Amino acid sequence: MKKLFSLLFLTLMTLPIMAQKNVYKFSVKDGNEHTVKLKDYKGKVLLIVNTATKCGFTPQYETLQKLYETYKNQGLVILDFPCNQFGAQAPGSFRDIHTFCTGNYGTTFPQFAKINVNGRNESPLYTYLKAQQPFKGFDMNNNIGKFLDEKFRAENPDYAKDPSIKWNFTKFLIDRQGHVIDRFEPTADMKDVEAGIKAALKMK
């Protein structure tokens, strides 16, 4: 009974978030803890990414920066949200993380304060993103995808039905109207991510 009431409470709490029609009602904190309203990005194509500096996927920063440089003049903005929930792979302060990313990968896209993307203290933005685009499955054509699938399946055979963020560098693609139009798991080919970005940039 107690679990039922807890589930009901969480459902009621998230209903206003689920009812949102786009990402523009949400606000986030930048590295200096200043509020940034996502409505400031109206008309842009957004790629929202939860990141980490000590992860096997961290080199994706290089590709993300190249994508940003290639498409920013067409309207692409990449929003970087460091998250320490997966293997504690985003340690340190915002300054530590920002210095690492700019020094090692030359990143110039916006980077925000560290957040949680799952659980009781998750960012409301991520509650919304996950509700709009569920888990898409790992790429089973590479060894990392197979490893992650085995890892999560051992913990929960039905893990794929859970929309939660599974690991660092999960990406959500937002169109120019603020709608969440796609999700890319960390094992997704970055060429597919680029193709999604190009298609979104062509949309009116």
In which residue ranges do the predicted regions lie?
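Amphipathic alpha-helical repeat scaffolds
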Residues: D30, N50-K54
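Conserved helix-turn-beta segment immediately C-terminal to the redox Cys motif
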Residues: K44-V45, T53-K54, T58-P82, C101-Y105
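Non-catalytic, surface beta->alpha helical segment in thiol-disulfide oxidoreductase systems
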Residues: D182-M203
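N-terminal "domain-start" segment that seeds a small globular fold
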Residues: M18-K39
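Bacterial Sec-dependent N-terminal signal peptides
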Residues: M1-K21
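Thiol/selenol-based redox catalytic cores and closely related redox-interacting motifs
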Residues: G106-P186
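Thiol-based oxidoreductase modules, predominantly thioredoxin-like and allied folds used
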Residues: G75-G92, T108-G119
